[in-house]
């Protein structure tokens, strides 16, 4: 999986 933390925030902010 890619950066778990990064993706997490990206989806929330999206």
From Swiss-Prot:
State the superkingdom. Eukaryota
The name of this protein is Newly excysted juvenile protein 2
**Taxonomic path:** Eukaryota, Metazoa, Spiralia, Lophotrochozoa, Platyhelminthes
Organism (species): Fasciola hepatica (Liver fluke)
């Amino acid at each position: 999986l890619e950066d778990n933390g990064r993706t997490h925030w990206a989806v929330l902010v999206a």
